[in-house]
Amino acid sequence: MSGGLEVLSMKEDDVTKLLAAGTHLGDSNVDIQMAQYVFKTKGDGVPIINVRKTWEKLLLAARVIAAIENPADVCVLANKPFGQRAILKFAHYTGAFPIAGRFTPGTFTNQIQKAFREPRLLIVSDARSDHQPITEAAYVNIPVIAFCNTNSPLRYIDVAIPCNNMGKNSLGLMWWLLCREVLRLRGTISRELPWEVMPDLFFYRDPEEVEKEEQAKAEAERERLATDQWQTNQPAAPQQDPDQWADTMGVPSGGDWGDEPVTTAPVPTGGAPPVASTTATPATNTGSGFNQDDWSVPTTKTKDWGADDGGEWGNTEPKASTGNW
């Protein structure tokens, strides 16, 4: 289908994405109607889907979706958890109506119930697990587009897109490619520029992993806020001018440490400056502080410890006792 137009041909980047996601790997069981999409079988019995036929069916499905005037008349459905996030993203960008999770029987056939809808086109993620909406769509003549694996039955399916719909990366990539092609056919995005939306947004994510990532981000944010608050509350060290510091310590600015501070007496108005006295007043003990007399030479002569009035130790004789013991 896309061999005649260069614009619709499959690019190398698209082939790399399909092979990296494992879209070409089918199920070990092959339905007789899906055998036409199998390229060959590996030695371990796994069939390999022809990627070129996958791309051609993808373009056909995108043309069918773009032909619907009202995007809300397109219903996308996924019963498996792997495709629920993908259909929600597809509905967000294309304007389709999503049904994620369990399909309520009678949604397309029972007009009494509140959830009754009449879509013009139905797109399902798995032809085997979504058999109930496919059957109801056949009752009311709603065309069906389905992502089919090699073991999927093709009954009541109008456009089958062969791919690996069992892997979360493969199914998310197929929804991303279909969404991009629909937007290109509508003229919303250009073919010359890459789409800014990454395929990772269409991939399934485990709720437990998402919760752990959110907790880790919240913990990191709390630590960052605590660090910023601690740094904000710390007072800055006062920076004092060196000249002011020298004045408070009694050291002249720009002088040596050994120089004594010079104090200038105030000059009385209208007279000569006072003459400083040249006679030094001896320091006296005022009861506290330094006393010069403590360091002066004593005026009285003191005796040695061993000296006696009688002379040396050896020349002294004991005095005779004058009385009895």
Swiss-Prot record:
Name its GO BP terms in alphabetical order. Answer: ribosomal small subunit assembly; translation
Positions of the region Disordered? 212-325
Q: Name one GO cellular component term.
A: cytosolic small ribosomal subunit
Q: Where is the composition biased (Polar residues)?
A: 290-300
Name its cellular compartments: Cytoplasm
Where composition is biased (Low complexity), the residues are 234-247, 261-289
Q: Which UniProt keywords apply?
A: Cytoplasm, Ribonucleoprotein, Ribosomal protein
Function summary: Required for the assembly and/or stability of the 40S ribosomal subunit. Required for the processing of the 20S rRNA-precursor to mature 18S rRNA in a late step of the maturation of 40S ribosomal subunits.
Record text on subunit structure and interactions: Component of the small ribosomal subunit. Mature ribosomes consist of a small (40S) and a large (60S) subunit. The 40S subunit contains about 33 different proteins and 1 molecule of RNA (18S). The 60S subunit contains about 49 different proteins and 3 molecules of RNA (28S, 5.8S and 5S). Interacts with ribosomal protein S21.
Q: What is the name attached to this protein's record?
A: Small ribosomal subunit protein uS2
